[in-house]
């Protein structure tokens, strides 16, 4: 009987020990699971924070690129404007130089007879008149072309004068006809540059 009691007691202690080990194993497994879940959550949190940081960095990079592109566009526009200004200045200088180089002071033909000067003597303000009238050489060429439409087409420039009427001025040119002794064509050119023959056979 004593042996039976001793055996039951030993079995009871063995089962209790096994149950305790099982509970400890369960607790250990539970702790491992909780730790794994915590680590996984921490990893997700860290990954999320990293993604946010990466997105923020990407946003900064995009903003930086946009600023850089905007700065480059502004610089290119400034350079383009500067180039255009330089080109305009060059064109203005060339135009001014061309005007200066193309200006010809009024002059008489070789061995000129006083024909236009005799018909239309001018005693007014020559400087004021020339400021209103077109370029002398341009007006002379237009008058010569007009004179050659009547009679001989190789008339030679002789002399000029200026006619004034109500504050408006005209050039008066005379052209000698080499084929007709003592005959001249009288041509006027107004301030608009319009040439007109007033007498194709003026006799000196």
Swiss-Prot record:
Coiled-coil annotated spans = none
Enumerate the residue ranges of region (Disordered). Answer: 17-102
Location within or outside the cell: Cell membrane
Q: In the record, which residues are listed under signal peptide? A: 1-17
Write out the N-palmitoyl cysteine lipidation residues: 18
Q: Major location, coarse class? A: membrane
Membrane topology (UniProt): Lipid-anchor
Entry keyword annotation includes Disulfide bond: no
Composition bias type Basic and acidic residues, residue spans:
23-70
What the entry lists under PROSITE patterns is as follows: PROKAR_LIPOPROTEIN
| Positions of S-diacylglycerol cysteine lipidation | 18
One GO CC annotation: plasma membrane
The residue ranges flagged as biased composition, category Low complexity, are: 71-102
Asked whether the UniProt record includes Cell membrane among its keywords, one would answer yes
Q: List keywords of the entry alphabetically.
A: Cell membrane, Lipoprotein, Membrane, Palmitate, Signal
Supply the name of the protein.
Answer: Uncharacterized lipoprotein SA2158
